[in-house]
Amino acid sequence: MNFRISDTFTDSLARLTTDEQKAVKTSAFDLQINPAHPGLSLHKLDRAKDENFWSVRVGSDLRLIVHRTAESLLLCYVDHHDKAYDWASRRKLETHPKTGAAQLVELQETVREIVVSRAVERTAYTPTKPALFREMTDSVLLSYGVPTEWLAQVKLVDEDSLLDIADRLPAEASEALLELATGGKPAPRVAVPGGDPFAHPDAQRRFRVMSNVEELERALDSPWDKWMVFLHPDQRQFVERDYNGPARVSGSAGTGKTIV
């Protein structure tokens, strides 16, 4: 079984107190060593839209949300009981239908709330601002990694609601929409149909396999961007390519040549 953590888990862990973090880390180590440990009190979340979400009891009130299948155990989120359950009820783990990348996706009800709330904030004297992506086809939006669940709402987004939506989208989709909104032309995401959704370059930005306790300890003791060397998918293709001899990477300033 592959043991993974997500950036949403490390972000939520960082918001807890020091003592709470220690308790959560202990449970995470126990899960990695023995996911069937009887003392972990795993509970299936029957009301979650994703049938593979489970909670792990950490003390009297903290709950660790995990995504559990026969092949994988993914640490997704941690918080106090009600907040943890609410987080799980609003999300599901999906494989993007066009890019093949694994994504933790917020449900449509949440997305609609953002667009509607921005609309009601406007006064009767405020001109209606144009939707930024109304003319874009579903196929094009999907090629940027926008989840299917979000297509209709993304087409309603104007400049006032763009940042709210972008904060809740997977990174590759968020970056593409922000670039489009500023006049850019982002490249479509790399499609890996039929492959391991967690091995996709975009999925590697948010999910990582923990091979041993030492690696997990490093991951939990530092912010996500500190312990993980992140390569943008455009950089990764140069790093992982096989060359017959010396190779030169060229590009304008700020394109990531030094990191490669």
Predicted regions and their residues:
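Enriched for short, Lys/Arg-rich terminal
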Residues: 58-158, 162-165
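Walker A/P-loop
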Residues: 243-260
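A short, surface-exposed loop/turn module that caps and links secondary-structure elements
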Residues: 29-56
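Hydrophobic, helix-prone linear segments
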Residues: 1-29, 40-43, 66
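Short coil/loop residues immediately preceding or within conserved phosphate-binding loops
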Residues: 53, 226, 244
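Pre-Walker A adenine-sensing motif
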Residues: 226-241
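Interdomain "pre-motor" coupling segment immediately N-terminal to P-loop NTPase/helicase cores
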Residues: 151-213
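Conserved adenine-nucleotide phosphate-binding loops and their immediately adjacent elements
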Residues: 205-228
